[in-house]
UniProtKB/Swiss-Prot annotation:
Alphabetized InterPro entries for the sequence: EF-G-like_DII, IF2_II, IF2_N, P-loop_NTPase, Small_GTP-bd, T_Tr_GTP-bd_dom, TF_IF2_bacterial-like, TIF_IF2
High-level lineage: Bacteria, Bacillati, Cyanobacteriota, Cyanophyceae, Synechococcales
Region (G4): 728-731
Gene giving rise to this polypeptide: infB
Stretches the record annotates as G3: 674-677
Pfam families: EF-G_D2 (PF22042), GTP_EFTU (PF00009), IF-2 (PF11987), IF2_N (PF04760)
Protein name: Translation initiation factor IF-2
Location relative to the cell: Cytoplasm
Biological source species: Prochlorococcus marinus (strain MIT 9303)
Chain spans, region G5: 764-766
Length: 1124
């Protein structure tokens, strides 16, 4: 099948199991243009051709019900084993839909039987020319008793006009025909063919009725031939006569199977459709007409679509029929109603009897070999026997098993030409006949073929090859078939399997087409674009972006090319470019998807806890913009002063505090989490929201809604927790709580006073106003939420913060969300294994155990755990270590990917910048007090412009600065940056010895500013044009070849060797250096405003009055980082 929905002729023939020429012939009948086997036709035309071929195949393969003219095949089998010595009367078989029967009377002149040896010599040495018989009829003859007949093929007559087979109807194949004596006469040929039972010829004399074999599919087994019957005087009895049968009128027109067009000289006369061929001796029939034998057809089942002409015939057992030389007139037609091939001189004019390959040797040599089968007579009668006794029982051949359709491997050979000369002492067959003789002798070959090809039989070759010729080949194949050996009886059953397996084998074209379809389907399935693109890092390569968008990388490269950007698949793209490309393909971009970090992914309460749940304290996260008073509000609640001791007055850690208050006469606990408000601590805020139950949003009354306020709102909504708004700083001048409510209403946070569902409480942290009301609202919302946990199980929770203490080692702040944590418990926090050695609360008091919603600091981890990881207590260390091992490998892979992403730069960009001297890198080693601070600083560094200077963080970890860090910095030329940490012993001395720059910060603002200034310091300073002044030309003085301009300084000043630009009528006519500056014939360095001077330039002398001279100089200026 071609890609345009067409099919080629050879592919259609392969599907139908036919030859190319058969399909071409069918296409010609349907007026379909097809020149050769490689021509393409449409699916509709292919369907028409298939219908035509299948219709013809069905018509030819059905059991025949009515005989047709010109298509008779008579097959005679060996007699069944009986003791009867009488001659069995031969019977003529009823014709099938594609056959016509004609029984020839025997006409030899000798009334006595002749021995086989004598006949062999006579037939070889003296072939008799064909003679014209005088109205012969058959009479009963005597023959040697109990000799089996060799299969005989009847001469086949062909009408003068082409005929189409009529629609066959089923008939009984086992019903014997009544014996009828033949006679010659002119009678309507259709009269003898209307009955469903076949009419046959008999010989006079009573005898047993011939036994009819009910399995017509297998060819007759060759046996011993009986002596031919003697001719007798024509009889005058009235009986249905064997005669040339004309063309009956078909009841229903049926399309004939496609066949090869006949040569011009062999086409029947279409103008005389009603004329039947006459026997020899008639007025319109010539004697000695050249005859051709039918083409052989392979043994066994016919192929699909092929008429089974021989397979459906009745096989008769009895005495063979003697042929007369008068058969020549009607034997000149083949089974397809075509003229036959001419016979050799001396041979009868009728169809020559096909002989087995073993008998060909006897025919070609003057004397026969002893022990070889005797040849046949030239008149068609059997000469000798194979030496069997009278009582020998011939083997009964069973029909072969159906075989799968199989295309012929070569063209079948045909009979030699009649006029071909024969050299004495030399066989006249070709090599193909020898080859086929060897094949016929092989017991493994079931499809017997005999090809007797003459030199001048090109037309016969064309007719008998392929689909059309196989219909004729059954006659020769059946006559030459030998009994199958018992070994090979089971082999035909395996042939259909082999044929089917061979047909299932894929060709190269089919395999390529299948792979192309699979690739196309996979590409179409892959092109399901995501609804939203989440960019985890600041940049992506073209290939990574193509994979995330489920498109080809070439599409992105083409899109970038149209935007003026030349990129490769390994090119790194920054966030603006990624957004532009993604929007072009209709996919929005979200960077770092901070909302995902705030979503609650793990359910802490399991099904086994449902029977043991009790109320637990709420976890409240205080969120809001920087400097809006979150920590001051917590100080007012806790009655402490944490804000006063914080560096820079801002919170840079997440803190966990537990407050116990009296509510309704009962003590109630509330756990508060204080989150940073600086923009660098987005991950900390998201972490706090992930574990919280209630979010308290602090908004300053004098500042309103700010960016981090909006971020806190999105975090709370992502975590699906209730929001309580605390409007702080109501005591300050300019405070407007109503304005804050209005701004919050724009974010779908509507106050209860305005008909919404959000609790808003105006408070003052400094004066302590409405603090009790805020706590009451928190407890009220807690009761509505119905927070519960199971304290009687092993603890589960989240790591809020972690850091490396100089004395205590790794320390983690844990929030227990379910169960009870006890000292000595073995827990796994992400990829870190720990055993609780000690626990302290927010006030520093040691604890033995901690229940749900408690926040504690735990000691005893193997290393600093990652903030935000969930921890779980295991019953023993073995199970915990197994879990940690799996997580550690995943954590290493993730950490390596992040490090590679931080230093990712495309090779093309690096080589280009290096060639221009623009490649700059700043190597950093970052040490901080807690994991959250490291996370915040790394996130801020990602936001810095990286077009001209790349920041590479070689090492980032919580803890103090060690001597190992100093050695790494010295080897890589890095700067050590510490945040709220100290230097270990020996690190300071090592840094001084190696000259490593160590910076320590306690406020994140200053740290980020210094890093940005260091990055700008790596940039080359740029030259900036600085204006000096202007002067106007008042007069021009010519001195030799040069000229001097007398000028008046209008603004600024002029300096010698400065850059000048001469403008004339707003056009620049010269730009260069000022070489000479004089005042009153003295060289001066500069001239100020309001003075006159003379100016000379070595490369310019075309001064004119009223020219404007602009003086400037180039100065270096520190470059700043550009975001583009």
């Amino acid at each position: 099948m071609t890609s345009s929905g067409k099919i080629r002729i050879y592919e259609l023939s392969k599907d139908l199991g036919l030859e190319n020429k058969d399909v071409l012939h069918a296409a010609e009948k349907l007026s379909i243009a097809a020149k050769s086997h490689s021509s393409s036709i449409s699916d509709d035309e292919a369907k028409r051709i298939r219908g035509l071929l299948r219709q013809g195949s069905a018509a030819n393969s059905a059991p025949p019900s009515k005989s047709e003219p010109g298509k008779t095949i008579l097959s005679v089998k060996k007699a069944a084993p009986t003791a009867i010595k009488d001659v069995a009367p031969p019977m003529r078989k009823a014709t099938s839909s594609s056959e016509i029967s004609q029984v020839k009377p025997s006409a030899p002149a000798n009334p006595t039987p002749t021995s086989p040896e004598r006949l062999s010599r006579e037939s070889v040495a003296h072939p008799a020319p064909p003679t014209r018989p005088v109205n012969p009829t058959t009479t009963p003859t005597s023959s040697p008793p109990k000799t089996a007949a060799r299969p005989v093929n009847a001469p086949i007559s062909r009408p003068a006009t082409p005929s189409r087979p009529s629609a066959p109807t089923p008939r009984s194949a086992n019903k014997p025909s009544s014996p009828v004596p033949p006679s010659t006469g002119s009678k309507d040929p259709r009269a003898g063919q209307t009955s469903t039972s076949s009419k046959a010829t008999t010989v006079s004399g009573g005898g047993p009725r011939p036994k009819i074999i009910s399995r017509p599919q297998s060819p007759a087994a060759p046996g011993r031939s009986a002596p031919p019957a003697k001719p007798s005087i024509p009889s005058d009895r009235k009986a249905p006569k064997p005669e040339l049968v004309g063309r009956p009128k078909p009841k229903r027109p049926v399309v004939a199977p496609p066949s090869r067009p006949e040569p011009e000289g062999q086409r029947p006369d279409k103008k005389r459709p009603g004329i039947s061929p006459r026997p020899i001796g008639g007025p319109n029939q010539r004697a000695n007409t050249p005859q051709r034998p039918g083409a052989p057809i392979r043994q066994g089942k016919t192929r699909p679509g092929q008429p089974r002409s021989a397979g459906n015939t009745l096989e008769l057992v009895g005495k063979p029929i003697r042929r007369d030389r008068s058969d020549a007139g009607s034997a000149g037609r083949d089974s397809n109603n075509r003229p036959g091939a001419p016979t050799r001189p001396g041979m009868p004019a009728g169809m020559r009897k096909p002989v087995a390959p073993g008998e060909l040797m006897q025919l070609q040599k003057p004397t026969g070999r002893p022990g070889t089968p005797p040849p046949r007579r030239p008149d068609g009668t059997s000469v000798g026997t194979r030496g069997g006794s009278e009582g020998a029982t011939p083997p009964v051949e069973r029909p072969a098993s159906p075989t799968a359709p199989k295309r012929p491997g070569h063209r079948p050979a045909q009979a030699p030409a009649a006029g071909a000369p024969r050299r004495p002492g030399r066989p006249d067959w070709d090599d193909s006949a020898k080859l086929e003789a060897l094949r016929n002798k092989s017991p493994q070959k079931q499809r017997q073929k005999v090809h007797i090809i003459g030199e001048n039989d090109d037309a016969l070759t064309a007719e008998t090859s392929g689909y059309a010729g196989e219909q004729q080949a059954v006659v020769l194949t059946a006559s030459l078939a030998r009994p199958a050996k018992p070994k090979s009886q089971k082999k035909p059953a395996s042939k259909p399997v082999a044929a089917l397996r061979k047909r299932k084998k894929e060709t190269t074209r089919q395999r390529q087409r299948r792979r192309a379809m699979e690739l196309r389907a996979a590409r179409e399935a892959k092109q399901v674009r995501p609804e939203m693109l989440i960019v985890p890092e600041a940049n992506l390569t073209v290939q990574e972006l193509a994979d995330m968008l489920s498109i080809e990388s070439s599409e992105i490269i083409k899109s970038l090319f149209f935007k003026g950007i030349t990129a490769t698949v390994t090119q790194s793209l920054d966030l603006p470019t990624i957004e532009a490309v993604a929007e072009e393909f209709g996919v929005p971009v979200l960077q770092d998807d901070i909302e995902e970090a705030a979503k609650k992914t793990t359910e802490m309460i399991e099904e086994t806890d449902l029977a043991h749940l009790i109320r637990r304290p709420p976890v409240v996260t205080v969120m809001g913009h920087v400097d809006h008073g979150k920590t001051s509000l917590l100080d007012a609640i806790r009655k402490a002063r944490v804000a006063a001791v914080e560096a820079g007055g801002i919170t840079q850690h997440i803190g966990a505090y537990q407050v116990e208050i009296d509510h309704g006469g009962q003590p109630r606990k509330i756990t508060f989490l204080d989150t940073p408000g600086h923009q660098a601590f987005t991950a900390m805020r998201a972490r706090g929201t992930k574990v919280t139950d209630i979010a308290v949003l602090v908004v300053a009354a004098d500042d309103g809604v700010r960016p981090q306020t909006l971020e806190a709102i999105s975090h709370a909504r992502a975590a699906k927790v209730p929001i309580i708004v605390a409007i702080n700083k109501t005591d300050k001048e300019g405070a407007s709580p109503e304005r804050v409510k209005q701004e919050l209403s724009d974010q779908n946070l509507l106050s209860e006073e305005w008909g919404g569902d959000v609790v808003m409480v105006p408070v003052s942290a400094i004066k302590g106003e409405n603090i009790d009301k805020l706590l009451e609202m928190i407890l009220l919302v807690t009761e509505v939420e119905d927070l519960q946990a199971n304290p009687d199980r092993l603890a589960k929770g989240t790591v809020i913060e972690a850091h490396l203490d100089k004395a205590k080692g790794p320390v983690a702040t844990l929030l227990i969300q379910n169960g009870t944590l006890k000292t000595g418990d073995v827990l796994a926090a992400g990829p870190v294994l720990g055993k609780v050695r000690a626990m302290v609360d927010d006030s520093g008091a040691r604890l033995k155990q901690a229940g749900p919603a408690d926040a504690v600091e735990a000691l005893g981890f193997s290393e600093v755990p990652t903030a935000g990881d969930e921890f779980e207590v295991y019953p023993d260390e073995k199970s915990a270590r197994a879990v940690v091992g799996e997580r550690a490998s995943d954590a290493r892979a993730t950490r390596l990917a992040q490090q590679m992403a931080s230093r990712r730069v495309s090779l093309a960009a690096m080589s280009g910048q290096a060639s221009d001297g623009e490649l700059k890198e700043l190597n950093l080693i970052l040490k901080a007090d807690v994991q959250g601070s490291v996370e915040a600083i790394l996130g801020s560094l990602e936001q810095l412009p990286k077009d001209e200077v790349q920041v590479r963080v070689l090492l980032s970890a919580p803890g103090e600065i060690t001597e190992t860090d100093v050695d790494l910095a010295a080897a890589s030329g890095a700067v050590i940056v510490g945040f709220n940490t100290s230097m270990a012993s020996g690190a300071k001395r090592a840094a001084d010895a190696t000259g490593v720059d160590v910076r320590d910060y306690d406020v994140i603002y200053k740290l980020l500013e210094d890093i940005q200034m260091a990055m700008e310091g790596l940039l080359e300073p740029e030259l900036v044009e600085e204006s000096l002044g202007e002067a106007e030309v008042r007069a021009v003085f010519t001195i030799g070849k040069s000229a001097v301009a007398g000028c008046y300084i209008t603004t600024g000043k002029l300096q010698r060797n400065c850059r000048v630009r001469v403008r004339r009528a707003k056009q620049v006519v010269f730009e260069g250096d000022l070489d000479s500056l004089r005042r009153n014939k003295d060289d001066v360095k500069e001239v100020a405003t309001g003075f006159e001077c003379g100016i000379g330039c070595d490369r310019f002398a075309n001064w004119e009055e009223r020219d404007i001279i602009e003086a400037h100089k180039l100065v270096t200026k520190r470059r700043t980082l550009s975001s583009s």
